[in-house]
């Protein structure tokens, strides 16, 4: 289904901050013969957005649809091959659009970072999407495209090199600068409220395999909680601290492994951290950043401080200014070792504010990939992830617009090495041999000014 439609890609939420950025990206970069539409609640506001996009968007149709109106969502889904949506918080009001696309056989992509929303989407829409042929793809922005594609590419490199399965794998955010939007804040507050109100939902969010297609089949690998404090990592040889997006990214990556039949390996362990290097200031920076993360979490949970944050940060529908978006960037490394004893390094980098400039590129290219690259995509349908829905096809698109997604082996396979799939995993050495040029030395730049 979905092949004979009026439009190729529809941007739902095009009048919001993130939606305008995605629409602008498509106006500038989509091939001229791609049929694109703008959707939202107000035809007048949609027309205003279209007028600001220039000549490329002059003929783009406007579709009026409301998340509170299932009939309008059904019509929207049936009109397009792909719907990309930026309307959040998704948990509060996004499931109806997922259901409409799943039933219509329409591919869907969003920017959610909400574990509870994705779990509900899996439980309610997996069967319908698998039956209709729809690809429902969550987390198509900074969370969780770099993580998900990065690990997939490492897996493919290791397999091509005969290095076996992935074992301990760590994503390190080595540098980043960007802004924070009101929509992101609203999503964080909404999930926090739900977790506080329900012990069951709290346990689900804390489960490392919350998004697994078969929780009972997941391997028992011991403690896989996300890092919640500063610590010196003897294997990476640097100070590390918590990474704000680990709670969603790690679960998406683990789902990708399971959806692919645990292709990365049954003993694949994955975590994400912020890297602070090994210099004299590193422990202070790591401890300070960790304390700041905990203070922010406490502030979101406490009524008076939450209200203060609402006043200081942009309201939903607003976000960082043009200068912040243009001068932002992110740099990520992913370290892995394999069952044959090899080590690989992945590098993911992009210019532009991660949460908005870079994310608008990721979601825009996701929409084009789903619409135009069908013959290159994995033969899957259902509630998927960026890696399992698009894989290398999306990586190729992102590279073509300036993103770096690279892998390399940083140690050679030992002579006569064999995969250790049937052997017990050895514990990590406290101080393994140092591998030259395989770990970041810079300090993380965190700049979340509400400009």
Describe the predicted segments one by one.
Residues 2, 156-431, 437-438, 442-451:
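C-terminal catalytic/substrate-binding lobe primarily of soluble NAD(P)-dependent oxidoreductases
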Residues 8, 81-82, 107:
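Structural motif
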Residues 9-27:
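N-terminal Rossmann NAD(P)H-binding glycine-rich loop of SDR-like oxidoreductase domains
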Residues 25-33, 260:
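A short, Lys/Arg-enriched amphipathic alpha-helix followed by its capping loop at the start of a domain
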Residues 31-45:
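Conserved glycine-rich Rossmann-like NAD(P)H-binding loop of the short-chain dehydrogenase/reductase
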Residues 53-69:
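Rossmann-fold cofactor-recognition segment
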Residues 64-80, 86-89:
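Conserved Rossmann-fold cofactor-binding substructure of NAD(P)-dependent oxidoreductases
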Residues 89-207, 255:
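Glycine-/Pro-rich loop/turn segments that contact NAD(P) or position catalytic residues
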């Amino acid at each position: 289904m979905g092949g004979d439609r009026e439009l190729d890609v529809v941007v739902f939420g095009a009048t919001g901050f993130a939606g305008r950025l995605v629409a602008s990206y498509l106006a500038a970069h989509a091939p001229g013969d791609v049929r694109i539409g703008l959707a939202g609640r107000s035809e007048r506001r949609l027309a205003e957005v279209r007028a600001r996009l220039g000549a490329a968007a002059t003929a783009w149709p406007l579709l009026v649809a409301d998340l509170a109106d299932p009939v309008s969502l059904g019509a929207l889904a049936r009109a397009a091959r792909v719907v990309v949506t930026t309307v959040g918080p998704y948990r509060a009001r996004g499931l109806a659009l997922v259901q409409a696309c799943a039933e219509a056989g329409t591919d869907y992509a969003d920017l959610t970072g909400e574990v509870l929303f994705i779990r509900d989407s899996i439980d309610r829409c997996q069967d319908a999407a698998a039956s209709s042929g729809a690809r429902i793809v969550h987390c198509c922005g900074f969370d969780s495209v770099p993580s998900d594609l990065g690990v997939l590419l490492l897996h493919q490199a290791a397999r091509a090199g005969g290095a076996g399965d992935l074992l301990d794998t760590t994503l390190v955010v080595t540098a980043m600068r960007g802004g924070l939007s009101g929509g992101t804040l609203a999503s964080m507050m909404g999930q926090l409220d739900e977790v506080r109100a329900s012990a069951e939902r709290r346990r689900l969010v804390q489960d490392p395999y919350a998004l697994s297609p078969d929780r009972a089949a997941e391997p028992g690998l011991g403690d896989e909680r996300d890092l919640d404090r500063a610590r010196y990592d003897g294997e990476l040889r640097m100070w590390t601290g918590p990474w704000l997006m680990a709670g969603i990214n790690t679960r998406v990556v683990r789902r990708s492994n399971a959806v692919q039949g645990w292709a990365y390996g049954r003993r694949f362990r994955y975590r994400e951290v912020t890297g602070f290097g090994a210099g004299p200031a590193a422990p202070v920076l790591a401890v300070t950043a960790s304390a700041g993360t905990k203070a922010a979490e406490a502030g979101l949970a406490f009524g008076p401080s939450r209200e203060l944050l609402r006043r200081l940060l942009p309201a939903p529908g607003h976000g960082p200014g043009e200068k912040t978006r243009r001068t932002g960037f992110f740099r990520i490394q992913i370290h892995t070792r394999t069952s044959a004893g090899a080590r690989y390094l992945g590098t993911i980098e992009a210019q532009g504010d991660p949460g908005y400039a870079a994310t608008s590129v990721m979601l825009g290219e996701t929409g084009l990939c789903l619409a135009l690259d069908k013959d290159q995509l994995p033969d899957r349908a259902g509630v998927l992830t960026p890696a399992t829905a698009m894989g290398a096809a999306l990586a190729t698109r992102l590279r073509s617009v300036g993103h770096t997604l690279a892998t390399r082996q940083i140690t050679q396979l030992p002579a006569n090495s064999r995969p250790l799939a049937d052997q017990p995993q050895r514990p990590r050495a406290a101080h393994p041999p140092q591998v030259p040029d395989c770990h970041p030395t810079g300090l993380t730049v965190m700049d979340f000014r509400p400009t």
